[in-house]
Amino acid sequence: MPASKQELLKDTNGECSLNPNKYTPVIEVVSPDSSSFTRLKKEMYISDDYEAELRDLIKQKKAVVLAVEAGGRYVGRVTLRHDWGGETSIVEKDFPGLPQINALEIDENYRRQGLATMLVTAAENEARRQGFSMIGLGVEISNEPAKKLYEKLGYSYQQVGGSDTYDFLFGKPNPQVYKLQLMTKSLRTEANHG
């Protein structure tokens, strides 16, 4: 059973990081069999292929979809996955069992308001709750805003297969190759080290 909404919103200090002066975003775990998932697919433009992949992973208990709602609609989403998929299985060779933050997306009208940080924190909390001590993500080498965000949140760059980058193929029927960098973060808190 995934964590409660309040548990997902707490940062590493156990504080809830909402800004009550704007609106109150709500982060929730979205089940693929719910009407909420249908809404999320439409409002956050999830492709049929990715939907099928998510449904399969969730049935196998290898993924959790988290979404943020504000103003009565979904404005952001992220997936916590326990796999790295076919082309990126090179990551699993060097970092076996490392869960990943995947498909972080915020509606362009809601960016730079802390929602990405909230979703990443929620995914980290869910991974921690599931017993993981580290988490990773792949970031496109040219995506400077995302790299800065992840660095600010404590992620560090790792080599994969002896290289600073790895290839990720995306899209069907003619996949495009993206160069990604692996970033990881320890999920252990100071209290866990003692």
Language model regions located:
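Conserved glycine-rich acetyl-CoA-binding loop
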Residues: A103, D107-T121, Q130, I141-K148, ...
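C-terminal "cap" of GNAT-fold acetyltransferases
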Residues: E7-E15, N19-Y23, S133, E140-K147, ...
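Conserved residues at the C-terminal ends of beta-strands
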Residues: R81, G138, G161
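Generic detector of contiguous secondary-structure segments
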Residues: L54-E69, G131-K147
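Residue-level detector of high-confidence beta-strand sites
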Residues: R77, Q158-V160
